[in-house]
Design a protein with these regions (language model features):
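Short, well-ordered beta-strand elements
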Residues: 79-87, 148-149, 246-248, 259-260, ...
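N-terminal secretory signal peptides
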Residues: 1-13, 17-30
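Append "and occasionally in soluble cytosolic enzymes with long acidic Gly/Pro-rich linkers
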Residues: 355-485, 489
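N-terminal lobe/hinge region of extracytoplasmic solute-binding protein
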Residues: 44-143, 174, 243
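Surface-exposed binding/hinge segments that line
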Residues: 151, 185-230, 245-254, 397-413
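Extracellular/periplasmic solute-recognition and catalytic clefts
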Residues: 193-196, 251-262, 287-351, 358-362, ...
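Aromatic- and charge-enriched surface segment that lines or borders ligand/interaction sites
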Residues: 71, 75, 96, 103-108, ...
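Gly/Pro-rich hinge or "lid" segments in bacterial periplasmic/extracellular proteins
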Residues: 106-127, 174, 218-285, 290-297, ...
């Protein structure tokens, strides 16, 4: 087995290579080899090279897997996808754009720019805790699982043909950690050090308190070209197309109107197991609209050929245009089997009036989800009862023996309800003013120390109980108003 696949540092040598301060700088300056370090500091070696990383256990796919199980490895290439992106991150804006630098705070970047960049490893969507090698052919992990040596594929290339090396990976992590978008800086602040061992090996050491979920996240960070940013300011918001190495690159665009991502036909990684069946469209065109309804009209006119719908009223009442009727547009629901997000109001616990949990429970009882779902959401919603909805981590029923083993040391420090049935939200009569639930809410408020002063609910100092709602869209006013009327009844 080649050295690139089975790096065998001692723990002491590895920590020295990755330490902050003069010791780490001296090692980098002298180019102390792994062999010399190992000879000077005998000790535990790295484990065998792995083809991926998993947070909770073994990898689902073997080292010789041919493709991810949910893709068609023989999917035809070609065509164009035209859409409004259903999700975005960093400084991306779905309504307009003025920069292609998506990894900083400044500017409004075009969504989907990340498709232009390769990463060390990529996620396998049927394993939410696992990543498999893309630029990194394999990874070796220290015994304490805090130091990771990524072994790069020698064939990895940027779009200009230049090799993608460990220097680029180290530069990327350091740059994103110190100059990147605040989200990236926060994540990468848990890295202790990044060290280039040789052109095809980069060693990343995590801080002792870092979560075991960090390594797959670090392995999913975009890889930048060090050479490119030696002549370009990383922190500058610009429409210069950055040099990258991924399956797509920026093609035609009009600022604020559209951007086309062009498939790179000779992308170096197109035949890897993690890539087969992906990046099938020749062109992915992102369209920009400042109004949701205008974006929907673009679908009806054929400007878009894909749309993910987030508005239940539109889904229930407006997908009846001719292209749907004659089958040119297919309306379908797909179970995604992924952890669901949460939508709701989050109570500001820094406000003293919300400190008592009985007060918060009362607020929950006053919201009639069943009425709201029937009358406002067209029956399309299901009530969220966990931050881990639609995942194996959602609490259901009584704690299992394994869960109790984790919980018992905390008995007396957490609520006893933790040891009973998992919480489920109240179910109303659907009338909009369920008297039983409102009566229970009133009782809880009185138990929490609130009293009646005529029609007002006041605290011990006579201050009225007021609530301010902050929403990110005026569309939710129709949801707030019935809820507010129920709160006024209390």
């Amino acid at each position: 087995m080649s050295r690139r696949r089975s790096l065998t540092f001692t723990r002491r040598a590895t920590l020295r290579l990755g330490a902050f301060g003069a010791a780490g700088a001296a090692l980098a300056a002298t180019g102390l080899s792994g062999a010399r370090a190992q000879a000077e500091a005998p000790g535990a070696a790295f484990g065998p090279a792995r083809h991926g990383l998993s947070v909770f256990g073994d990898l689902q796919l073997p080292a010789d897997f041919s493709h991810f199980p949910y893709v068609n490895p023989d999917a035809p290439k070609g065509g164009a996808m035209r859409l409004v992106p259903p999700q975005w991150g960093y400084n991306q804006n779905p309504q307009t754009f003025n920069t292609f630098n998506t990894f900083i705070l400044a500017g409004d970047a075009a969504p989907m720019m990340e498709t232009c960049f390769d990463t060390l490893m990529v996620r396998q969507l049927e394993e939410p805790d696992a990543v498999y090698g893309l630029v990194a052919e394999s990874v070796s992990v220290s015994d304490d699982e805090k130091v990771f040596a990524f072994h790069l594929r020698p064939e990895a290339r940027f779009h200009d043909g230049a090799p993608l090396t460990a220097e680029d990976v180290a530069f990327s992590l350091e740059t994103l950690r110190t100059k990147g978008h605040p989200t990236l800086r926060q994540i990468l602040s848990w890295i202790d050090s990044v060290t280039v061992e040789d052109p095809e090996t980069v060693v990343v050491a995590m801080k002792a308190a870092a979560s075991n979920r960090l390594p797959p996240t670090v392995a999913s960070m975009p890889i930048l070209s060090k050479a490119y940013y030696e002549t370009h300011d990383f922190q500058r918001s610009s429409l210069d197309v950055p040099l990258s190495s991924g399956p797509y690159t920026v093609g035609r665009y009009e600022t604020g109107r559209f951007v086309e991502y062009q498939r790179v036909a000779d992308w170096w990684g197109k035949d890897l197991p993690v890539s087969r069946g992906h990046a099938n469209f020749d062109v992915v065109r992102v369209e920009f609209f400042r109004d949701r309804q205008i974006a929907f009209q673009a679908l009806t006119k054929g400007t878009l050929n894909f749309r993910e719908e987030f508005t239940s009223k539109t889904w229930a009442t407006e997908y009846n245009f001719p292209a749907v009727e004659d089958g040119r547009v297919v309306k379908a629901e797909f179970p995604d089997n992924l952890p669901a997000g949460a939508q709701g109001w989050f109570i500001n616990l820094r406000r003293e009036k919300f400190a008592d949990p009985r007060t918060r429970q009362a607020l929950g009882l006053a919201f009639d989800f069943q009425w709201t779902n029937t009358n406002l959401f067209y029956g399309a919603y299901e009530r969220t009862s966990s931050y881990f909805e639609n995942s194996e981590m959602k609490a259901e029923g009584m704690p299992s023996a394994a869960e109790l083993a984790l919980l018992e040391p905390l008995r007396g420090q957490v609520s006893e309800t933790v040891f009973g049935e998992a919480w489920t939200p109240p179910v109303s009569s659907g009338s909009g003013t369920d008297r039983d639930l409102l009566r229970r809410a009133n009782d809880l408020l009185l138990e929490a120390g609130w009293t009646r002063d005529g029609r007002r609910l006041v605290d011990a100092q006579g201050r009225p109980f007021t609530i301010e709602f902050l929403d990110n869209s005026p569309a939710f006013e129709r949801v707030v108003q019935p809820y507010a009327r129920n709160l006024e009844r209390l």
